[in-house]
Design a protein with these regions (language model features):
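Bacterial N-terminal signal peptides that target proteins for export
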Residues: 1-7
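Regulatory, intrinsically disordered low-complexity regions in eukaryotic nuclear proteins
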Residues: 4, 21-25
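C-terminal motif of bacterial Sec signal peptides marking the signal peptidase cleavage site
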Residues: 16-19
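First exposed extracellular module after export/assembly in secreted or surface-exposed proteins
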Residues: 27-167
Length: 167
């Protein structure tokens, strides 16, 4: 009986020690307000839709880089569209993608991508199919394997609601 009291006491002490562990609080990335999963339609020269959300069957991801700076981001279509994956400069306070040229397409390591002026994220600028207010994105890009054609990727940020997803 005495032994079981000591075992019970040891168990209670160990539970007390481990229950005092603080909860993990993750830190935000340097580009947290621009990060996300985006459902986009694709236009040529802002007027001709060449692919709707349902045609693509996937999303674009914007995320910070390993350097975690507020001046550079990754844009990745997850092989759903072109395919492309590119690191681009951003103006984080204004939520814009800086106009810049010659970014290596990391998806194929051959072609380059130009980001055209006017690419941006608009806070609460869209209404999703489930009628939730969410951010919108406009990306204007030119690909070196299709020179002279400006592709506009326009859409909304994923809300987490199943009816807003197109995959």
């Amino acid at each position: 009986m005495k032994k079981s009291k000591y075992v019970l006491l040891a168990l209670l002490v160990s539970l007390g020690l481990f229950s005092c562990k603080k909860d993990f609080v993750p830190t935000d990335s340097a580009t947290v307000n621009m990060n996300g999963e985006w459902w986009v339609a694709i236009f040529v020269d802002d007027s001709i839709m060449i692919a709707d959300y349902s045609d693509i069957g996937g999303s674009i991801i914007t995320t910070n880089t390993a350097a975690n700076t507020s001046s550079t981001m990754m844009i990745d279509d997850q092989n759903n569209i072109w395919p492309f994956k590119v690191q681009v400069p951003v103006d984080y306070p204004n939520l814009t993608f800086s106009a810049s040229t010659g970014h290596l397409n990391l998806a194929d390591s051959v072609n380059t991508i130009d980001v055209i002026d006017g690419s941006r994220i608009i806070k609460d600028g869209a209404t999703s199919p489930s009628l939730h207010t969410t951010d919108s994105i406009v990306l204007k890009m030119e690909f070196s394997d299709d020179p002279g054609t400006i592709y506009w990727f326009k859409g909304y940020k994923d809300t987490g609601w199943p009816e807003d997803r197109w995959d």
